[in-house]
Amino acid sequence: MLGMNMLLITLFLLLPLSMLKGEPWEGCLHCTHTTWSGNIMTKTLLYHTYYECAGTCLGTCTHNQTTYSVCDPGRGQPYVCYDPKSSPGTWFEIHVGSKEGDLLNQTKVFPSGKDVVSLYFDVCQIVSMGSLFPVIFSSMEYYSSCHKNRYAHPACSTDSPVTTCWDCTTWSTNQQSLGPIMLTKIPLEPDCKTSTCNSVNLTILEPDQPIWTTGLKAPLGARVSGEEIGPGAYVYLYIIKKTRTRSTQQFRVFESFYEHVNQKLPEPPPLASNLFAQLAENIASSLHVASCYVCGGMNMGDQWPWEARELMPQDNFTLTASSLEPAPSSQSIWFLKTSIIGKFCIARWGKAFTDPVGELTCLGQQYYNETLGKTLWRGKSNNSESPHPSPFSRFPSLNHSWYQLEAPNTWQAPSGLYWICGPQAYRQLPAKWSGACVLGTIRPSFFLMPLKQGEALGYPIYDETKRKSKRGITIGDWKDNEWPPERIIQYYGPATWAEDGMWGYRTPVYMLNRIIRLQAVLEIITNETAGALNLLAQQATKMRNVIYQNRLALDYLLAQEEGVCGKFNLTNCCLELDDEGKVIKEITAKIQKLAHIPVQTWKG
C-alpha cells in the first residue's frame, strides 16, 4: 500500500553501500534514484512516510542522521524506504544550577572526527538565571560592556564572597585553559541587546572523557570587568553528555506568522470552491458511511485541499466512451496539498512556450528539445529508451502528443483525469504551456475516523448519542445487608392508606419505612434532575463554541472590510457569550451531595 505522502531529499554526495541484511546501509543508495527537475539531473532519496510492506522487510538504512526501514516488494520492483526516524545522537547540554535546571544551551556532536565540542552562553544571562549571591549590577552600562573581559571561573568555596576568589581562576577568557574546558570571549557589535552583549564560547577539549556522561557540576563565578575587582555573581553550571533521539520533522514550520499570512493566495475558481460541510455530506453519501468523522487539514482558503496520484500504465482505469474523449473545456485549477514525484512526465520549455503551469520532479521525462527541434526521453540517463507503448496509448486524442510535444493540441485531459503540474492540477492546459506534468487523478484530502477514535482528539468532542450511565433499578444485585435507594424503593413499594384516610391505622414501623422510602425517592429524583441540568449545560457550551466559530469564520471572510462590525457599520458591536456551564455543574454537584445518603445496612 503506497503512502499518502512521498517526500524527497536531494543528495550531493554518494556514500559506499554495505548490503548486509539486518544492518544499517549507509547512504540508502538502494532508495536513491536519478530524477530530473527541469534540465537538471540530481540523485534523490525517495521514501514514504506511511507504507505497509507487503514483501520482505530487509532491515534499515541511514542517511543524514535519519534511519529508514527498507522493504523489498518483490517481482523485480525497486526497494522502498519508509518510516523515517531520527537516529540516536550525542548531545552536550549546559544547565543552570543542576541537572534538572534551566537549559542554557545544547549542541549535537556529529561523527565528523572533531575532538572538541563548543557551546556558547551569555554571562549576564546565567547571572540572572541562577546566582547564589545578590546581583548588584543590573544597569544597561553593565550589560553593554562588551569591550571588556568576561570571566567565568570556579569560585574558592560556596561560603566566600565572589569578589575575594578571583585569584583562584581556572577557566577565564584572558588566559590559557588549565583544565578540560577553555573559555573564549566572543566579540559583538556595540549596539547589542540585553543578554547578548557578554557572550562566552565554552569549548570542551576532551568530549570523550567518562566524566561528561555522568555530568560535571562546576561552581562558577562570573563578572564582566577584568581590569579591577568588581561586582560579580556565583552560579552552578551543570555540563552533561547525553544520547537521545529527536523526532524527524517532516514538514516545514512557518518561521514568521506574518510572512505567511501576508502571502497572497491564488484566487480559487468558482468550480473549485466548496464548503466543508457540503463536501463532508457528499463524501458520506458517496461512500455510504455513517457514525464517523470526516477529517481533513486546515483549509486556508475557501477551497478544499486536494491530493494527486499519477495514472500508471498498469492501473486498471475503467475506459468508457466519455473517458476516451477529452473532457469539456474548462480552465479550472485545483490546488494540491502536496506535490508528487512523476514517473512518466511530459515537459517542454523554450521561447515558444510562454505559459508556466508548474514543475515536477520526475523519474522519467518525455521532453521537447528546442535546440534539436524534436521530442526525446530521459530516465536514468539521457540515452534511455522511451517506454513502449506510451503511457497515453489508451487515449487517442493524446497518444500522438507523447511523441510530438510541440505539435498543436487542445491539451484537454480525458474525463475523470487531470494534468498534475507541481502544486496545481488542470482539466486543460494552455496552448503554450510550459513546465512538467503527468496525467493522473485527484481526490479531496480527507480521511475517515470512527466516533470512538474521535474521543481521543485534542479538542473535546461532544457525543450527542452517548449519555452518562446512571444506576438502573435492579433486583437482587445487592448484598444481603446493603440497602441503596433503588433497593428500598423496589422492596417497599408506594405507600397505601386506609379508606378513611386516617394515618393512625398504620403502625409506626410502617410510617418509618415510608419516610425511608421517601428519602430514597428524593435522592433519585435529585440525581435525575441534576443529570438533566448537566445535559442542558453541555448543550449551551456546545452552542457557545459553534457561535464563536461562526463569528470567527465571518470575521475571517470579511477581514478586508474590518469584520462583521465594519461590514454593517455597527457602532455597538459586541459578542458576549458567558459559559455558565461550569457554574451549573457545580450547583448540581452540591445538590447531589446534599441529597445523597450512603448505602444503608442493618447496622446503620
UniProtKB/Swiss-Prot annotation:
Q: Where is this motif: CX6CC?
A: 565-574
Key word Disulfide bond present? yes
Specify the signal sequence span: 1-22
Tissues showing expression: Expressed at higher level in adrenal, sebaceous glands and placenta. Expressed at lower level in bone marrow, brain, breast, colon, heart, kidney, liver, lung, ovary, PBL, prostate, skin, spleen, testis, thymus, thyroid, trachea.
Subcellular location(s) of the protein = Virion
Q: Where is this protein chiefly located?
A: virion
CXXC, short sequence motif: residues? 165-168
Indicate the annotated site residue(s) for Cleavage.
Answer: 471-472
Superkingdom of the organism of origin: Eukaryota
Question: Which family is it part of?
Answer: Belongs to the gamma type-C retroviral envelope protein family. HERV class-I R env subfamily.
Recite the other comments.
HERV-R_7q21.2 genomic and subgenomic RNAs have been observed. This provirus is intergenic, the closest flanking genes being ZNF117 and FLJ25037.
State what protein this is by name.
Answer: Endogenous retrovirus group 3 member 1 Env polyprotein
Give the gene that encodes this protein.
Answer: ERV3-1
